C-alpha cells in the first residue's frame, strides 16, 4: 500500500495532472490533489495519555496566571527559530530543562517549537510542510513528526510554544501546545483572530511588520470575542465552529521599521493597550526587528529588559 505522501497516490481520479482539465473553469491552477490524514487518525497513531495532557493543562494555567497577574514570574519562550531535526530538538530540550528548573522561581520557561514558517516571498515553509527539506512536501509525515516531537517534549516535562500559521494544523497538534503565537504577517488576518478565539492555550499576537501595536491590540480584542467560522473537525469533516473567545491573549513586541524593545517602546505599547481597555502585558521578541536579525544582539536586548520598570516588564 502506498503511503499517503507518495507523489502518485490517489490524485483525484488517479492521474497526476487530472485536475488540469481544460474543459473546466474551476481548479485550473491546481496541479494535483493528495489525501490528507485526518486529525483523529493521527491522534490514534500518536496517542496521548491523560497524565500527559494534564502537564499541558498545568503549563497553560501557569502562563495564564502570569498574564492575569496572579503569578509574578516572567514567561520566557526560548528555542530555535524553527524545528528541522527531531534529535537536535530533544537534545536542546534536555539542556533547557536543567536551566528552567534552576530559574523556576523567577521564570516560567517555554520551549519554542515552531513547525511552520511564514515567508515574505518563497522558501522552506517548515517541518510540517516539508519535513525532508527537499521540496517533497510530505505533509502527512510532517504532521506526524511534529506531533511525535511535541509528545516527547511534553513527556520530558518541557512546555512548548508554537506559531499557528496554517488554519488546519491546530487540529493535529494543538492539544500538546502550552502557548501559541500569531505572527506579524497574520495578526491582522480575520481568520487567525477567529482561530485564536477558539484555541485552548494562551496566545501572543505580534505587532505588525511595520511596528504597529494597534494591529495587535485589535487582534486581542477580536480574539476575546466569540466567533463562528468554517473549519475541519477531528474526523476530517467540514463544520461550523462557534467559539467562546480567548481571554488569555497578549502582545508580542517584535519591532518593525525600528525596534520597540526599549523603555519608550514598551511604555508606548502599554499606552495603546490601556486605551483599548486591555491589560498592560507585553512580551518582547529579542530577535526579528528588535535585533536587526543579528543574533548577537539578542543577549544585549535581554539584559536591557531587566532595567525596565516592574509594572511594564511583565510578560
Residue ranges and their predicted role:
Residues 67-68, 101-104, 152-157, 273-277:
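Acidic (Asp/Glu)-rich catalytic clusters
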Amino acid at each position: 500500500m502506498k503511503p499517503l505522501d507518495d507523489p502518485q497516490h490517489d490524485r483525484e481520479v488517479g492521474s497526476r495532472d487530472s485536475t488540469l482539465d481544460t474543459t473546466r473553469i474551476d481548479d485550473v491552477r491546481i496541479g494535483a490533489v493528495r489525501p490528507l490524514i485526518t486529525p483523529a487518525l493521527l491522534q490514534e497513531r500518536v496517542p496521548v495519555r491523560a497524565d500527559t495532557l494534564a502537564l499541558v493543562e498545568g503549563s497553560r494555567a501557569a502562563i495564564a496566571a502570569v498574564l492575569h497577574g496572579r503569578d509574578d514570574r516572567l514567561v520566557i519562550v526560548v528555542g530555535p527559530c524553527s524545528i528541522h531535526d527531531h534529535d537536535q530538538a530533544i537534545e536542546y530540550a534536555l539542556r533547557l530543562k536543567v536551566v528552567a528548573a534552576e530559574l523556576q522561581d523567577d521564570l516560567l520557561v517555554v520551549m519554542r517549537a515552531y513547525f511552520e514558517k511564514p515567508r515574505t516571498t518563497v522558501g522552506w515553509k517548515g517541518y510540517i510542510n516539508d519535513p525532508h527539506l527537499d521540496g517533497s512536501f510530505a505533509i502527512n509525515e510532517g504532521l506526524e513528526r511534529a506531533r511525535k516531537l511535541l509528545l516527547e517534549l511534553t513527556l520530558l516535562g518541557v512546555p512548548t510554544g508554537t506559531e499557528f500559521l496554517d488554519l488546519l494544523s491546530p487540529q493535529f497538534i494543538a492539544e500538546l501546545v502550552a502557548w501559541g503565537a500569531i505572527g506579524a504577517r497574520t495578526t491582522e488576518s480575520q481568520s487567525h483572530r477567529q482561530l485564536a478565539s477558539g484555541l485552548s492555550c494562551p496566545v501572543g499576537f505580534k505587532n505588525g511588520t511595520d511596528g504597529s501595536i494597534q494591529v495587535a491590540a485589535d487582534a486581542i480584542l477580536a480574539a476575546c470575542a466569540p466567533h463562528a467560522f468554517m473549519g475541519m473537525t477531528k474526523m476530517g469533516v467540514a463544520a461550523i465552529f462557534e467559539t467562546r473567545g480567548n481571554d488569555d491573549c497578549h502582545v508580542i513586541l517584535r519591532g518593525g521599521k525600528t525596534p520597540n524593545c526599549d523603555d519608550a517602546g514598551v511604555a508606548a505599547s502599554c499606552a495603546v493597550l490601556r486605551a483599548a481597555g486591555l491589560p498592560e502585558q507585553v512580551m518582547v521578541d529579542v530577535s526579528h526587528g528588535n535585533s536587526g536579525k543579528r543574533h548577537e544582539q539578542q543577549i544585549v536586548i535581554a539584559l536591557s529588559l531587566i532595567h525596565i520598570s516592574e509594572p511594564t516588564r511583565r510578560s
